[in-house]
Curated annotation (Swiss-Prot):
Residues 24-51 bind DNA. GO terms for cellular component: nucleus. InterPro entries: Fungal_SecMet_Regulators, Transcription_factor_dom_fun, Zn2-C6_fun-type_DNA-bd_sf, Zn2Cys6_DnaBD. Transmembrane segments: none annotated. Fusarium verticillioides possesses 2 unlinked loci, FDB1 and FDB2, necessary for detoxification of antimicrobial compounds produced by maize, including 2-benzoxazolinone (BOA). The FDB2 cluster arose as a duplication of the FDB1 cluster with rearrangement and expansion by incorporating additional genes. It comes from the Eukaryota. The lineage of its organism: Eukaryota, Fungi, Dikarya, Ascomycota, Pezizomycotina. Keywords: DNA-binding, Metal-binding, Nucleus, Transcription, Transcription regulation, Zinc. Gene3D superfamilies: Zn(2)-C6 fungal-type DNA-binding domain. GO terms for molecular function: DNA-binding transcription factor activity, RNA polymerase II-specific; RNA polymerase II cis-regulatory region sequence-specific DNA binding; zinc ion binding. Induction: Expression is induced in response to 2-benzoxasolinone (BOA) exposure. This is Transcription factor FVEG_08294. It is found in: Nucleus. It comes from Gibberella moniliformis (strain M3125 / FGSC 7600) (Maize ear and stalk rot fungus).
């Protein structure tokens, strides 16, 4: 018999079915054919069964399609990006979810260490620039400093608990003056409490100067997406970098002239010409801090403060990734200048705690480098020696500014500054502004600023006890008068010695409205002058308020009436400076609300205006309740007019700025409290001996003071820039127990919502 034909067999044969390496659980139990489709096979879909794949012990060599792995990686990457964006935008904004957000951040970070990441495109070896996905941002390659290795996961599935912070604020801080105003308001409402007010006054001051209620620590920079080796070397387009450098040296680089522009631009041009193949890590970090500072302050480029801060955080995170650890291990002039730039940036970016801590590191590094010693600079060439000296002077000035703001002891004594020249003309350096004039305008500005901050330091030592003790120095009206008189003479002598092109300006003059770099320096000097004048005369205003509302001063008994009258007369000097500050800023911002006006950075303007507003509020309290039954209507009208100008300033100063909104809201609430009508009734009743003076105040005043107390416990971050995180429930210690109990129930939610700004 002939064998069967191959052709006949081929007609009846069928194609082999594809072998499935792993069948789903349902098909294996039913012993049916499984097509292996993920996530659900066709059989399970048709039977509406739950399709699950569980590899057995023999499935170690199961082959999974590459496309499936790629899809999983893509999905995980997208989820991670969404989580990062949510954490970045909403951490601190959803107060009720603060704990959950922190845990989500840790969980997401742990998940990233375990899950595979989509590999980034490899950098071409022949190109010096690494492009991002859109190809628009270059990357610096070939960093000369060794890159710090990231810490590896310890495998313990550790979850960090919340960190808490508390702080000390001394007599020069705004929080101290605000406490005094609130205590005075409380005593106006409750005259009977004056009898026992002085018994525990010293103990109360000692306790309230410490922020006893801690708050959880959140870092807005840490909440942003991770900065990897590639991200931290990313640079904006060359045109954008050129623009930001130009803006820096025209603004901040003139106010703080400690970086030589020509040398900086030469290094920048060299790195750019070499496609950033070789660049010092410190230089790249310094460049990013400059970009962060300009990005946060350039209102003309981005009107919204929130958007500017988001963009600024990107540059700041790159800078810290590059130089944060390096600055603790290496000492060089570039590292010191980097730290000074970080202090300036943090002070203007509502990171006051970072500014204070990093300033300490900058001072130590500068001393280790010998910047405080003229002999150590003798071996340097003239240019290096001059800019080393300028760096030390800027550190000294920042030390005094932060010491006043925080109410804490200064680090650098005046004995370390004896070798500073009396005029910058002795060491004049050529600058673009001085071309053809032979005058180093930034150098002269730094020299006169240095002498002004020396007067500020004298006020700290003589009037505020150097902010050394937890309590205010024992108030002595005679010593306060003598100190303020001497410091006022020094301040006026400083003003008279200014060069003609840096003379102080008046609010009604034409100079503030003419936008030039020199006029901007004059306006800044004028604002600094009046701010220090308020600092010098504020102790006299405090003595007046204590005498009128807090039972007077037991120390100055002899001739107390005469001394108090002198103190009251001198206290008006602080109000005059507050008036000049508000009117000057109001005139400039009404004429030109753009970021190119003569005010400079909005943050520092906000600081000066807010400090002046507190002085005006003190004068309102004095005029409304401090001189018998009749209020000083003339002074009240003038002060309320000034606060009306302050409200206009806050509206025009910046857009979408939560700190400005908070300042405006706080001033308005303080004004309501200080002008409460029932307080007058309380004073009148107390003077007439009416027993009703000891009865609880009206519901209106109780509500206002409850609101103020409530703001004191939660709505106080507006002080962070200059009072250094004023958050302190001690502001409410002198208020009625009923008000405290009424607000306690709502305190937590309000506190969290405000701190989330």
């Amino acid at each position: 018999m002939a064998p069967p034909s191959v052709e006949n067999g081929s007609d009846t044969s069928t194609a082999k079915r594809r072998r499935i390496a792993l069948a789903c659980n349902a098909c294996r139990l039913r012993k049916s054919r499984c097509d292996g489709t993920r996530p659900s096979c066709s059989s399970c879909v048709s039977l509406t069964l739950d399709c699950q794949y569980e590899p057995g012990e023999s499935a170690a060599n199961v082959i999974v399609r590459k496309q499936y792995i790629s899809d999983l990686e893509s999905r995980v990457y997208n989820v991670e990006q969404v989580v990062h964006r949510l954490n970045y935008f909403f951490e601190g904004h959803l107060s009720a979810c603060a704990t959950a957000t922190g845990n989500a951040t840790v969980t997401a970070a742990a998940a990233q260490s375990r899950l595979p990441r989509i590999p980034s495109p490899p950098a071409p070896s022949s190109s010096a620039l690494e492009e991002t996905n859109d190809g628009s941002h270059p990357h610096a390659t070939g960093l000369e400093e060794p890159q710090d290795e990231d810490a590896t996961t310890n495998g313990m599935a550790m979850t960090f608990v919340e960190e808490h912070t508390s702080a000390f604020f001394g007599g020069s801080s705004n929080i101290n003056f605000t406490r005094l105003l609130l205590k005075a308001v409380n005593n106006i409402r409750n005259p009977a409490r004056r009898l026992g007010a002085t018994v525990d006054q010293q103990h109360e001051l000692s306790e309230t100067n410490l922020a006893k209620a801690s708050r959880s620590y959140t870092n807005p920079v840490a909440a942003s997406p991770d900065t990897g080796p590639k991200a931290m070397t990313t640079l904006p387009p060359a045109q954008e970098m050129d623009r930001m450098l130009d803006v820096y040296f025209k603004t901040a680089g003139t106010v703080f002239p400690f970086i030589h522009e020509e040398s900086m631009r030469k290094t920048y041009t060299t790195c750019k010409a070499s496609n950033w193949t070789r660049v010092r890590r410190t230089f790249l970090g310094t460049l990013n801090v400059i970009f962060a500072t300009i990005a946060s302050a350039d209102q003309d480029a981005i009107p919204s403060a929130r958007e500017r801060q988001e963009r600024s955080n990107i540059f700041f995170k790159r800078a810290t990734a590059l130089c944060s650890e390096l600055s603790k291990q290496v000492i060089s002039i570039e590292i010191v200048q980097y730290l000074v730039l970080v202090v300036i940036h943090c002070q203007g970016a509502q990171r006051s705690v970072q500014a204070w801590n990093i300033l300490g590191l900058a001072v130590r590094s500068a001393m280790a480098l010998g910047l405080h010693s003229a002999q150590a600079r003798e071996g340097l060439d003239e240019l290096q020696a001059e800019y080393s000296r300028r760096t030390w002077v800027v550190i000294y000035c920042m030390d005094k500014v932060l010491s006043v703001a925080f109410g804490r002891p200064a680090i650098i004594p005046d004995e370390y500054m004896l070798d500073q020249p009396s005029s910058s003309s002795e060491v004049a350096m050529p600058t673009p502004d001085s071309a053809g004039t032979g005058v180093d305008i930034p150098g002269d500005f730094l020299a006169v600023s240095f002498r002004l901050h020396q007067i500020m330091n004298g006020s700290l030592r003589q009037q505020y006890g150097g902010n050394v003790h937890t309590a205010e120095p024992e108030p002595d009206d005679m010593m306060s008068l003598q100190a303020s008189g001497q410091l006022r003479k020094e301040l006026r002598a400083w003003s008279a010695s200014l060069p003609p092109y840096l003379r102080l300006c008046e609010p009604k003059a034409k100079i503030p409205s003419e936008n030039t770099s020199v006029n901007r320096l004059r306006v800044i000097l004028t604002l600094r002058y009046h701010n220090i004048n308020m600092l010098i005369h504020r102790p006299l205003l405090c003595s007046t308020i204590r005498h009128l509302f807090l039972g007077g001063n037991s120390v100055s008994i002899d001739n107390s009436s005469y001394i108090i009258q002198l103190a009251m007369g001198e206290a008006h000097e602080s109000l005059r400076s507050a008036q000049h500050t508000i009117e000057l800023v109001h005139t400039i911002i009404k004429a030109d609300p753009s970021g190119s006006n003569n005010l400079g950075v909005a943050y520092f303007t906000l600081h000066y205006v807010f400090t002046a507003s507190l002085v005006v509020l003190g004068r309102i309290l004095w005029a409304q309740h401090g001189q018998g039954a009749a209020a000083d209507e003339t002074a009240l009208a003038m002060c309320k007019s000034l606060l009306g100008q302050v409200e206009t300033i806050f509206q025009l100063l910046d857009h979408d700025n939560s700190l400005v909104y908070s300042c405006s809201r706080y001033i308005n609430n303080m004004l309501e409290v200080c002008t409460a009508q029932d307080a007058i009734v309380a004073v009148q009743n107390a003077e007439s001996g009416d027993s009703s003076a000891h009865q609880p105040p009206s519901s209106l005043a109780a509500k206002q003071l409850e609101t103020m107390m409530h703001l004191g416990m939660g709505d106080m971050e507006m002080f962070q820039a200059y009072s250094s995180q004023i958050y302190d429930p001690a502001l409410s210690e002198g208020l009625d127990t009923s008000s405290v109990e009424a607000a306690t129930a709502r305190n937590t939610d309000w506190e969290n919502s405000f701190w989330a700004m």
